[in-house]
Regions:
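Short, glycine-/aromatic-enriched active-site segment of Class I SAM-dependent methyltransferases
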Residues: 161-184
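A short glycine-rich, Lys/Arg-flanked "PGG" loop and its adjoining helix->strand segment in the class I
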Residues: 139-154
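Conserved class I S-adenosyl-L-methionine
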Residues: 53-62
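A short acidic, Gly/Pro-enriched loop at the edge of an enzyme's catalytic core
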Residues: 115-126
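Conserved alpha-helix/loop element of class I SAM-dependent methyltransferases that forms part
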Residues: 34-52
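Short alpha-helix
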Residues: 186-201
Length: 258
């Protein structure tokens, strides 16, 4: 696993690659998707049980694709934060194009330092949609979240994790995980570490599961093929499929318990 990742690396990465992500993924940068963006976001909103009137934080918002779809469907107030100036510019343009300036506010900032930007006990819901994996220190990210989420607030994390290691064959996971970290500016964790961090910070996990929708990896595979990114030894063909052993996509829903 890459150990020297810092938040500046992530900023530089997305300043360079955001246009390419938009070209390949559209406005939702997620490797695990389903048959349509609307279906994906409806699924996530239903799992969280988003309701009108909620105050929501989109932590690591990309170009605000998910938040725009949520704000179109619900009467909510969304604060969105990205580390990238380029993503901020795209987000503002997208929000304006969809006439959602009264529902979504986006800023450039570091989601490890949320109290610099937001009031205490502000949010009913916080979500990280394949964004916490960019954190050099996920414990610091969740600790920062404690300052701004309400007691009883809901936290949703959809992310990729290191798969279970095969005894005597650690390189089976080590090589692709290291390659993914290096190529996509990530620091992939085990699910056990993230669950421990949540427990230490006072979150009660309501569910932890593989997302229950038809899994589609076409955009991620097309992106890596287009840019000739090789993540497997002797790779010949798509690197993502439903039978991966070195990666595990999971969703977590937790409540701020204390």
């Amino acid at each position: 696993m890459k150990n020297n990742l810092n938040i500046k690396d992530v900023e530089i990465y997305y300043e360079k690659w955001t246009d390419e992500y938009i070209d390949s993924f559209g406005e939702i940068f997620q490797a695990l998707t389903t048959d349509s963006n609307e279906e994906l976001i409806n699924y996530i909103a239903n799992i969280i049980d988003i309701k009108d009137g909620m105050k929501i934080l989109d932590a690591g918002c990309g170009t605000c694709g998910p938040s725009i779809l949520i704000a179109k469907k619900y009467n909510v107030n969304i604060e969105a934060i990205t580390i990238s100036q380029k993503q901020l510019s795209y987000s503002k343009a997208n929000i304006n194009k969809n006439n959602l300036n009264n529902k979504i506010n986006v800023i450039k900032g570091d989601f490890h330092q949320l109290k610099k930007y937001y009031k205490e006990d502000l949010f009913d819901v916080v979500y990280y949609l394949e964004s916490l994996c960019h954190s050099p220190e996920p414990h610091e990210a969740i600790k920062s979240l404690n300052d701004v989420i309400k007691p009883g607030g809901l936290l949703y994390i959809k992310d990729l994790y290191r798969g279970p290691d095969i005894p005597g064959k650690l390189e089976t996971n080590d090589y692709p995980i290291n390659a993914i970290n290096e190529n996509f500016c990530l620091k992939i964790q085990t699910i056990g570490k993230i669950l421990d961090i949540l427990g230490i910070n006072g979150y009660k996990v309501i569910l932890c599961q593989r997302p229950k929708f038809n899994e589609v990896f076409d955009k991620g595979n097309a992106f890596t093929a287009k840019h000739n990114i090789k993540l497997l030894k002797n790779q010949d063909g798509p690197w993502i499929d439903k039978g991966l052993v070195f990666l595990n996509w999971l969703e977590i829903l937790a409540i701020k318990h204390y």
